[in-house]
Amino acid sequence: MARTAPVEPPLRHPAPPSPAAGEPRASAEAAVAPRRVLFADEALGLPLAQLRRYRPWGGPGAGKMAAATGQDGGGGGADEEDDGEDGDEGEEEEEAFPDPSPPCPVPAGGGFYLVPTFSLPPALGRLERLGRVMVELEALLPPPGAVPGGSGVWVPGGRPPVVRGLVRVLNRSFEKAVHVRASHDGWATFCDHPARYVPRSPPGAGVGGTGAGDPLLDPGLGLGPGQMSASSPDDGGCTDRFAFQLPFAEGASDGARLDFVVRYETPEGTFWANNHGRNYTVLLRIAPAPTPTDAEGLPQQQQLQQLEPQPECQGPVEAEARQLKSCMKPVRRRPFEEEPRMRSADDNTLAEHPDVRESLGPLLAPTPLRPWPQMTLQVPEVMLTSNPQEEGDIPRSNPPVAFTEVRQAPAIRILPATCGLGGPPRDQASGPDASDRAAGSFLEPTQQQVEAAWESGGGRKAPMVGALTDEPARGLEIVSGLDELLGEDTIDQELEQLYLSHLSRLRAVAAAGGGEGTSPTHALGILTDRDLILKWPGPERALNSALAEEITLHYARLGCGVELIKDTEDPDDEGEGEDGLSITPSSPEGGSPKESPPEILSGARSVIATMGDVWVPWAERSSSRCDSPVVLGTQGQFTENPEKGMGKDTKSLHLNRVIVGMSKSPGEAGTESQMEELPTERESSWVPSSEKELPLPVQQEQSPALLGPTGTEVCLSSVAKPHVNSQEEEGGSLNLESPKRSPMPAAPAECACGLAPQLWGPLTQTLGVLAGLVMVPVALNSGVSLLVLVLCLSLAWFS
């Protein structure tokens, strides 16, 4: 820019006032002298203006672009006239940031795509993110001469493949520098490219004042909706932008890779933006020009105008402006061009350009912006049947469909004691209700087997016992899981229904038999613990006691060789009466064995204590652990109610206690026996006078062992009958009592189970500590006593 000498306008000096009389002449001349203005260029030799020219990054045509946009009358000698410190600073700046070598352009016959493998962060919340990371990649800009199309941004041949972008940093200090480190060989080597500061200028001014038409910030080539306003947010100068340009390596071919990261240097420190440790990667894909369909239906003439070579006399700015003008025209759509082209079932590649699909690959291939037509997939009908088909029945014409077949769980036989749990009580005379009919399919086989066993007698009793052994084990597991959830009223009702059903069965059998000739010889041979044993936690009701008493008397009448005796005046004499008669079970050689009355255990383990050949649920599966037979014994006596005054009145008899002794095999010496006393409400009991017990052959099956008080498994090999206190039977009775007996404290009358011996020691220590420290808190008046008490209790319980 040529400078001209300043032209000073002529000054008209006003007429000096006439000096007053008596004033000196020198002061008058000083007041009239004109003022003189001195400029820096004339006085000091400094220029009035400085002009700097920046070379754009457009490659070989950068000089023409600069000349077309910012040429003046004397632009050629601008650098020559720039002398002094400013000229030296410009030379140092050019040396510090040398221009990158011009990249090798792609041949004019083809074009290329730039495929980034990362996603940019959204503009929303950018200021908050910059407060944490200090620097981030804001946008990737299309290369010069890019053509937007349906398959992405395509660059025609003859253009150098470069990557351009914007970096946003937090303005922490005035002195700052941004560099982009790029690598073409997987970080074997790298090069740092400086990023240039982008001033806050309106859109379209470009970078460095290149003027309108520079595609760096043009929304038509690379910046999506809202990206333009996000590029220059009104953040009050809190952030700054830097622009960079990265060339690909010389001779880059299809699949060339460019990795880069951003470094932000400030006096406070150095910060990096590396895509969360994964680096930023851009791939180069060589591809021909897009078709009108791929270019969103652009007319063929516009495509040819965009792809035709530019004349040499035409500058890049005019060429880019022409392309932008054609791209900004409204898109014309034709109906026949929007018709979707069907794909073949065997070939998934594009019908128009199969080579493009193969070169781009399935992952990095450019995806079209318009939606593809909805494809309808026909699924053959599948017939679902309840019965699973065989492998050979699957039709080969249809593809196999994987259906997961859920097999039904095996039906669990619900026991009569648990069929109506939680239901309202019903009258026995009204017959079976709906719940009994619903469960009939599960209970009918069991009832038929029971009736068949009653009719068959003792000859076919053993097979029926084996058929019923598997049911009680499953039933007890179900009952054990539900008894904790039931209340006392519900259990009373179920127990009453059990008694009524069992008593009605006994009455029906007695009525059908017509006497002792057809009555069953061994009632307990077909009865299981399902009918006779319940885990009863509460007291019995009056009706239940009466029903249990009647059932007991029924079994007492059926016994062979059993005679009820009258109780003596002496209650301590348990083994004899006034008539001197006792209940004597008949020998198995002479007739059927004696029938023992059923016991209903409360709060104890399920154990059947009978005499003679009786089926025991836990005995027939314990042969794997114990080889000796199982013998069960009872101790008690029938006594007469003094109020009745009749020796034969059996309704006044009540079961007092049943003592079950469990000992191990006879071959083991020094074994311990566990005794359980189960008291009831009355004091009368059964007293057998037999001197020997008959062993019971058990079946070879497995069964869960009975648990002792400490949780250990106790193998129930034999149960012995203890001593009889009567003097008449003392000499002839068989003493099966074990020599050693574990100490068992006397349990209170209300408790059904005795306390374990292992708990007496800790309980005694705990009571002693409580008695000794009851007055310590009052005496010490502090929290130390409580701590001592807690420690003592912990040592007592967990030692």
From Swiss-Prot:
* An example Gene Ontology biological process: regulation of glycogen biosynthetic process
Give residues where Phosphoserine occurs.
S18, S545, S587, S592
Q: What's this protein's function?
A: Glycogen-targeting subunit for protein phosphatase 1 (PP1).
In which broad location class does this protein mainly occur, judging by the first location in its UniProt entry? membrane
Lineage: superkingdom:
Eukaryota
Q: Which intervals carry biased composition (Low complexity)? A: 20-30, 585-594
- Give the location in the cell: Membrane
Name the residue ranges with Acidic residues bias: 78-97, 569-579
One annotated Gene Ontology cellular component of this protein: membrane
* Topology, Cytoplasmic side: 1-772
Source organism: Mus musculus (Mouse)
User: Any idea what this protein is called?
Assistant: Protein phosphatase 1 regulatory subunit 3F
Topological domain (Extracellular) residues are 794-799
Query: What tissues is it present in?
Result: Highly expressed in brain (at protein level).
Compositionally biased spans, kind Pro residues: 7-19
Q: Where is the composition biased (Basic and acidic residues)?
A: 334-353, 679-688
* Stretches the record annotates as Disordered: 1-30, 53-108, 201-235, 332-353, 417-439, 566-600, 663-688, 722-743
- Entry's transmembrane regions: 773-793
Instruction: Please list the residue ranges annotated as the CBM21 domain.
Output: 127-283
User: Which ranges form a coiled coil?
Assistant: none
What PROSITE patterns does the record tag this protein with?
CBM21 (PS51159)
Annotated motif PP1-binding motif: location in the chain? 36-39
> Is the keyword Phosphoprotein in the record?
yes
Q: Which keywords appear in this protein's UniProt record, sorted alphabetically?
A: Membrane, Phosphoprotein, Transmembrane, Transmembrane helix
